Amino acid sequence: MDEPTFWTLVESAKAEATPALSNQPEILQKKLEALPPREIVEFDRIFTQLHHAAYRWDLWAAAYIIEGGCSDDGFADFRAGLIGLGRDAYYAALTDPGTLARQPTRGVDFSNEEMLYAARQAYEAVTGEEMPDHGLVHPREPRGERWDHATAAKKYPELVAKFGVR
């Protein structure tokens, strides 16, 4: 599987999901179950690479503003939800996290923990076995510069305007 095919699967599941995107992981899992096991493994590898690439302080600051606080686990869920928004939203946010202010938010929870498990659950449903380890190691620390609450709000005024500071 290549990255364009990965994004086609993610975006088609998003298009079929309810506006809140809460059922997107379930739809994605069903799409993955129609693929050969090696393709499911490759999907998970690409997902993991993208998830790791988004482990950045600037995105964590954006998540903190959007979610009204954001723990380490919450940030993992946020990054999974960011991938679920699709290719354009994902890469725009990596370039400028402030672009997340342009995303529709009515009823949408940016964090989508279940996206983390869609491929693994699909693999288990198809093979009856656990997903093999692809050897990708999560970064020890986020990339970029640390932030505090005041600097995060100043850096992303468009997010503060849309989501407030909670």
What are these regions (language model features)?
Residues M1-E39:
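N-terminal leader/targeting peptides and immediately adjacent processing regions
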Residues E3-F6, P25, I40-F47, S71-F75, ...:
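Short runs of predominantly hydrophobic/aromatic residues within well-ordered alpha helices
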Residues Y64-L94, L100:
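Hydrophobic/aromatic-rich, well-ordered segments within soluble, folded domains that form packed cores
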Residues Q29-G69:
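A glycine-rich, hydrophobic loop/mini-helix early in the fold
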